Regions:
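N-terminal beta-strand motif that seeds the catalytic metal site of vicinal oxygen chelate
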Residues: 1-20, 62, 118-131
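Short beta->alpha transition motifs characteristic of CBS
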Residues: 97, 103, 114-121
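Vicinal oxygen chelate
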Residues: 17-19, 64-108
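C-terminal "cap" of GNAT-fold acetyltransferases
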Residues: 3-9, 40-55, 131
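Core segments of cupin and vicinal oxygen chelate
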Residues: 13-50
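Helix-adjacent hinge/juxtasegments
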Residues: 54-55, 60-66
Length: 131
């Protein structure tokens, strides 16, 4: 399989109080985004996202980029079905023209965004991922 993704962040490491709930939540959203997830009873790894069990010291905002609005909608619905809590349904935002996003809280209260930038793309050039 080969994917082309924009890059801005090297990696994000989250702690989850309930790793199984986080595994369900992230597998649902990342499955819609066609991102492979590897997990066991201690970890979840999906590209630059690493999650392990432990106590949180703070919450984060994490945004996943998509190539179209339909994928934003689908990922938001998948996240809700997998135990996420609505934090702003799919729609245009005023950050810049064409910014279309949806927000959910993951099982640990992190603010998860799925975004399509539309014509005003500001992401880095894509890299080729082969696995």
């Amino acid at each position: 399989m080969e994917l082309h993704r924009g890059r801005l962040i090297d990696h994000v490491h989250l702690r989850a109080r309930d790793l199984k709930a986080s595994q369900r939540f992230y597998a649902a959203i990342l499955g819609v985004l066609d991102i492979p997830v590897v997990s066991d009873d201690k970890h979840l790894v999906a590209d630059e996202l690493w999650i392990d069990a432990g106590e949180q010291s703070s919450h984060v905002h994490l945004a996943f980029q998509t190539s179209d609005r339909e994928t934003v909608d689908k990922a938001w619905r998948a996240g809700l079905a997998a135990g996420g809590k609505d934090n702003g349904g799919p729609g245009e935002r005023k950050y810049h023209p064409g910014y279309y996003a949806a927000f959910l809280f993951d099982p640990d209260g992190n603010n998860i965004e799925v975004v399509h930038h539309g014509p005003a793309q500001r992401s880095a050039a894509s890299v080729k991922l082969t696995f």
